[in-house]
Amino acid sequence: MKIIVQRVKNARVTNDTIDNQINKGYCLLVGVGQNSTEEDVKVIARKIAHARLFEDENDKLNLNIQQVEGEILSVSQFTIYADVKKGNRPGFSNSKAPEQAKDLYQKFNKELEGYGLIVKTGEFGTHMNVEINNDGPVTLIYESQDGKII
């Protein structure tokens, strides 16, 4: 699994059927790879839930999302696993098949909720408009494989 974590002042995802937004927190762009497993879901959700990406009174990144009462906007994004080595058009064979990816994506969001986090989502497998108001910017890439952070 690969997840781009962006610390945001606010973020919003919309399409014809949804309109979800958050204030302070993380916007997560979630990629589910061919070899992603439920163990990857658990380890990466735990890592993100406990990540200290917010400044304390000394401007050090010492506070996690719970401590600042932040929220999460989780958006599925299979293009994170694009292969751009050959030609000019990306290939997506490294992404998990849609039904399996959707299942792991939903489990990932539930796992985050299990840490007491408020998680709002986009709509899996559809075209969406995503508005991200980065804070910092603070942007990190988390990746798990074989149940371990890599």
Swiss-Prot record:
GO terms for molecular function: D-tyrosyl-tRNA(Tyr) deacylase activity; Gly-tRNA(Ala) deacylase activity; Ser(Gly)-tRNA(Ala) hydrolase activity; tRNA binding. This is D-aminoacyl-tRNA deacylase. GO terms for biological process: D-amino acid catabolic process. The gene is dtd. PANTHER family: D-AMINOACYL-TRNA DEACYLASE 1, D-TYROSYL-TRNA TYR DEACYLASE. A Gly-cisPro motif from one monomer fits into the active site of the other monomer to allow specific chiral rejection of L-amino acids. It catalyses: glycyl-tRNA(Ala) + H2O = tRNA(Ala) + glycine + H(+); a D-aminoacyl-tRNA + H2O = a tRNA + a D-alpha-amino acid + H(+). Keywords: Cytoplasm, Hydrolase, RNA-binding, tRNA-binding. Transmembrane segments: none annotated. Pfam families: Tyr_Deacylase. It is found in: Cytoplasm. Its EC number is 3.1.1.96. One of its GO terms (cellular component) is cytoplasm. Its main location: cytoplasm. An aminoacyl-tRNA editing enzyme that deacylates mischarged D-aminoacyl-tRNAs. Also deacylates mischarged glycyl-tRNA(Ala), protecting cells against glycine mischarging by AlaRS. Acts via tRNA-based rather than protein-based catalysis; rejects L-amino acids rather than detecting D-amino acids in the active site. By recycling D-aminoacyl-tRNA to D-amino acids and free tRNA molecules, this enzyme counteracts the toxicity associated with the formation of D-aminoacyl-tRNA entities in vivo and helps enforce protein L-homochirality. InterPro entries: Daa-tRNA_deacyls_DTD, DTD-like_sf. A motif (Gly-cisPro motif, important for rejection of L-amino acids) lies at residues 136-137. It is an enzyme of class 3 (hydrolase). Homodimer. Belongs to the DTD family.
